Amino acid sequence: FIENALNSYCEISVREAGTADFVERITGKRPKICIDPTLLLEEEEWRLLVGSKPIISEDYMLFYSPFPTKEQCSELLLLSKRTGLKVILTTPNGTFRLIHKKSIKYHINVGPIEFLNLIRHAQFVISGSFHAVVFSIIFARPFYAIDGMSDNRVSSLLKLTKMECYAVRPNTIKDPDSCREDFNKAKQIILTAKEDSMLFLKSALV
């Protein structure tokens, strides 16, 4: 069924190499790999959408996870102590408070704009979420991608931008200063990939 459905299309594009491999195995044809739609917009368009005023008035590090663990929260407390930054923890389920400490502040069930605002104005971002990682790159925020090389979407993005060193294993959150890659180089790579993707999309959709 999937093979017949895919073969009915004149052109196919996917976002990750792993997905391209899967489609090629089924159809015998290699699809075009295009960058994620979030990267097709200019950075300034995202900045205008988010706004320049932070919703958190003090310096902070942002931790986002659907299922944060007590071990991760303990590491965040140690990192907060080393850096002097308060931890802003946001999660989509919002049914718990793992640790009650003044240095951890919970922002539960934030909307899309608030989520992007938290990323844009953070001193440091820690997450396993693709969108947290991609917007950290867009806004040039230092970050770590938890288990990043095990996630198809995140690993493809990190490989594309040559930022694999930002991937960390769960429960091994590093110091923010232990890995500093050049965001300008990453953005230049993204610009080239964007131009290539736009050429394909314009051709395929005509």
Language model: regions and residue ranges:
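Active-site anion-handling motifs in enzyme catalytic cores
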Residues: 1-206
